[in-house]
Amino acid sequence: MPGRKWLVIILFPLTLLQLWGLDPNKSINKYLLDQWQTSEGLPGNMVISIEQTPDGFLWLATSDGLARFDGIEFSTIPFVRDEEISPLENAEPITLLVNQEGILWIGSNIGLTRFRNGRFKTFTTQHGLSENRIRHLTYDMKGNLWISFMSGYVDRFSEEKFTPYNDTHGLEATKINAIVEDRSGNLLFASREKGIFSFRDGRFFPYPITGLDNRHIIAMYQDRQGDLWIGTNKGLLRVNPRGITSYDSRQGLSHEYVIVITEDSERNLWVGTLKGLSRVNRKSDGTIGCESLAKSFTVFSLFEDREKSLWIGTENSGLLRLKDSKFTSFALPPRLQEEIISSIFSDRPGDTWIGSLGGRLFLFRENRLVETIEPPGLSGTGISAIARDNEGNLWLGTIGKGVFQKKNTAFVQFTTREGLADNLVTSIYRDNHGNLWFSTFNGVSVRYNDGTIKSFQSGDGLSGKVVNNIYEDKSRNIWIAADQGITVLPGGKTASSNIKYYLTGVPAVFIYEDPSPVEKEGPVFWISTDGAGLKRLTLKDNMIYSYTVEQGMAANSIYQFFAVHGNFWLMSSSGILRVSKKELELLAKRGTDKINCTSFGKADGMQSDEYHNELSRHSALQTKDDELWFVTIKGISILNPGKIHVNKLAPPVIIESLFIDGQPIPLDRWQQVFIGKRNFKFHFTAPSFLSPEQIKFKYQLQGFNKEWIFLPPGKERVVNYRNLEPGDYTFKVIACNSDGVWNRTGDSLTFSVKPLFYETTIFKIAVLLVLAALLTGAVYFYKKRPGTEKTKLQPVQKQEENEEDNIKYKGSNLNPIFADECMKKLKYLMSVEKVYCDAEISLQSLAKKISITPHQLSQLINERLNRNFSDFINYHRIEEVKIILESADEGDESITNAAHQVGFNSLTAFYNAFKKYTHMTPTQYRKEMKKKS
């Protein structure tokens, strides 16, 4: 088992350079700030220290114990055995440290604890430690561990031995709050009240720094430039060859009482204080500026993880995390905050028009509001669409008042009186001839260049009534996406006799013609739908391929989408999705089994994952710089695909725990052979923190599963195997992050299931031999009895029996060896093929699969399993339902679905059978399982 864990330790440092930290060019308020408290499972809201072990887990010293976090779940970890502390003591973690070897050290109120290879070992004064209450831990370049104490001096731990250092070595101070090794290898020890001491050649020497008088040193840190930063109760000091500089709230520090200092991978210097967190910006002229946030929090600890997020431990506000936002927000000025944005339109370079639900129109130039227009008659009526005609006039589609043409400063209204199909307009599209197409709630209208308007509705051949969008292909055909499918007008002519239809009955939303299709396929169209996923249509053969959640999409309701840098970016009911166009094409050609679809939402900085006017093309736009703008119910969220960094760090995969026949098995003392065990339950995880809810898994029990089994994101990371036959098995699990980067090495456990002695072939043969010997002896002695006449043994005739009347099986011709073989086949059919899920299963059909008579099968079940056929089938069905209910969603619907899924035609029969075998209802059973988990 240790070897299994060290593989993780070796793999991940190799990829650290592929990640990006917090962008130093962004304002500190542009980062995303997440928070976890006891309500989210954190043991205590005071987080004193944070570290990360090479297996990816985040470790937290909290006010209520040691916690381990994988991005989804917090686990409280007991790190001291009961016999190591007195009954009146509680082990309280104070400081954490992970050294160069990946070992976790825990300083607590009862001593020093080492976590290595899955095991804890605690050192106390009985092992040579100077004091049990530990204040601070650090390690030097030589691998020595240095320990400072709450009231004492310091110890060095090396080669399993503690060496104390005190005033006899020149250390004239206790309460060492920080220990730093500078770039020259000199160790500096910062005491709370008596300044700093340097250590060399086994002795301590004062390290005088001007300006420390009457200051208490709380923290000390040396950055990559070699500057020494000292946090005190009266501000921050920077020490370098140019001199000593002091900083406090006058320079922007959130508070003068500095508690913790660290530098991240992007060289941002972070300072935690009594009143919040500050980022120190070091300018080229040598000056610094500070930005602060979270001023209501007292910051106790700071840590940057391997995915480059900054973690913040607070005094009583739990755990915070800063990460880069993938979205930026675009909002109306504060005086217009009551306006709800309903549509956007990218006009001339740098110009963006925004329509509101209140009927107002705003022009932004280079993201600055330059004009506000209130069209007469539009007050309180939402603007749903914006476009410009060939003459440069602006057109507005509205929610109930038709369309408006803006000519200079005047507005001209067009409604059903002027020939518009309907007054509720969803979108406006200008074709290559300059004609304007208006999508409405009752068909489509086209305004030709000569000013005439013609409508095309369901009575004229339109597939559907509500039109969402219009698209013109390369051949100048007009495609109409409506609520009942797609209608194609050849040449854009509504009177054409060659109208074509696609996706009849499917609510089509948006259409996009592939600019570079495979030549042999001809024109290729991508079509989004409201509920039926994404479609790929090849005109040459009229083939349509669907991409839904079953194929790996995160949602089935897809709205507008864009092609950028080889990926599709799609608005959906599950946020903004990114999927590789190449992967989609491979899946259509069966070149892969699943696509990797990444979803972005509020966790990535999006204002909201709910939209306004989502079925219209005017709910989003793509700028000339390939920025994507999305209209949400809380404003506009902007995404730049070119600036989104792919997380190339594959998630570590760990099998956390194993339960066999309901009993936990310690993985640090792994045994590979289990005798007579049948039920195995594996818990696994993949510690990752950028998008942990999007981690995907695949698992396989080699020796049982022939294929990998896909576990979608969000599902419980547990798998059950029941009634395993004796044999050799390897359970393997792999995972990929939200960007589709797989850890294909994963984690695995190899084990063997051995039969109990009475289940072995040797035992069965021995029993047969003994029985044969007894029978032979009985016959022999019977023949030898005096006066016994020799008679011929008459063959026992096979007698048919009525199973339903439970008649005894007399004169059976099933010999034990043949019966054993039949039982193996029966177990395989039940555990692997799960034939009991067939609602039409019968004694005759099952006997045929085993190649025996129904009478013989009935005899097997009765004599070997002590059941009749009906009980036998229903027992397996109920066992399968129990597995389903342990992971299914709440509700009667899931129970009903489970009943039908395993073969019950009658709910009454299902409930009776479930009560018979479990002595409770399905709902009661699920509640009991949740309590146990």
PLM region spans:
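Carboxylate-rich, polar loop motifs that coordinate divalent cations or form catalytic acidic clusters
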Residues: 1-754, 760-779, 783-784
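Ca2+-coordinating acidic residues in Ca2+-binding motifs
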Residues: 424, 572, 845, 877, ...
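Short coil turns linking two alpha-helices in DNA-binding domains
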Residues: 725, 853, 905-906
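Membrane-proximal linker segments that couple transmembrane helices to downstream signaling/catalytic modules
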Residues: 781-888, 913
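Short, Lys/Arg-enriched C-terminal cap helix and immediately downstream tail that follows
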Residues: 868-873, 920-928
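Sequence-specific DNA-binding recognition helix
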Residues: 888-926
